[in-house]
Amino acid sequence: MKRKPMSRKASQKTFKKNTGVQRMNHLNPRAMRGGIRL
């Protein structure tokens, strides 16, 4: 799965989203594999 390079602003936005995903994964270890890469 290749990701398109993003502008800095966009990557910051998605980073915030992804930290939420990570936090959920700590509570739900079975979902870990998808983790940061969602």
From Swiss-Prot:
Cited function: Mediates ssDNA packaging into virion, it locates to the internal surface of the capsid, thereby displacing the internal scaffolding protein VP3 during virion formation. Additionally, protein VP8 plays a role in viral attachment to the host cell.
Single GO term (MF): DNA binding
Chief location of this protein within or outside the cell: virion
Stated family: Belongs to the microviridae J protein family.
Keyword DNA-binding in record: yes
Bias kind Basic residues: ranges: 1-16
Name of the protein described by the UniProt record: DNA binding protein VP8
Region span, Disordered: 1-38
Subcellular location: Virion; Host cytoplasm
Superkingdom, natural source: Viruses
Keyword tRNA-binding: no
UniProt GO cellular component terms: host cell cytoplasm; viral capsid
Keywords annotated in UniProt: Capsid protein, DNA-binding, Host cytoplasm, Virion
